[in-house]
Swiss-Prot record:
UniProt GO MF annotations: 2 iron, 2 sulfur cluster binding; electron transfer activity; metal ion binding
Protein name per its UniProtKB record: Putidaredoxin
GO process terms (BP): P450-containing electron transport chain
The organism's place on the tree of life at top rank: Bacteria
Cofactor(s) the protein requires to work: [2Fe-2S] cluster
Lineage of source species: Bacteria, Pseudomonadati, Pseudomonadota, Gammaproteobacteria, Pseudomonadales
């Protein structure tokens, strides 16, 4: 298990233990992180799991594929260089301690 910290737009921090192989979206939805919706169930087709990856981890997270990049263009919150869909971030030991900021809206 590795740690993930979700920081809500209001500054609330939730730390979760997440098993390797589980997406950050799955972990969030399963543990009541209500700011992350995940309507599509993890297929990168809805952009309701948009997060900002902490800069200390941007190089550790695999690059976004074309599908994810296309969906990121649809997000309603500000698009930043560290914007990602957390359904596409799969937990690995290298990501232990990752911090993601959740924007103020997913719609």
């Amino acid at each position: 298990m590795s740690k993930v910290v979700y920081v809500s737009h209001d500054g609330t921090r939730r730390e979760l233990d997440v098993a390797d192989g589980v997406s950050l979206m799955q972990a969030a939805v399963s543990n009541g992180i209500y700011d992350i919706v995940g309507d599509c169930g993890g297929s990168a087709s809805c952009a309701t799991c948009h997060v900002y990856v902490n800069e200390a981890f941007t190089d550790k997270v695999p690059a976004a594929n074309e599908r994810e990049i296309g969906m990121l263009e649809c997000v309603t919150a500000e698009l930043k260089p560290n914007s990602r869909l957390c359904c596409q971030i799969i937990m690995t030991p290298e990501l232990d301690g990752i911090v993601v900021d959740v924007p103020d809206r997913q719609w």
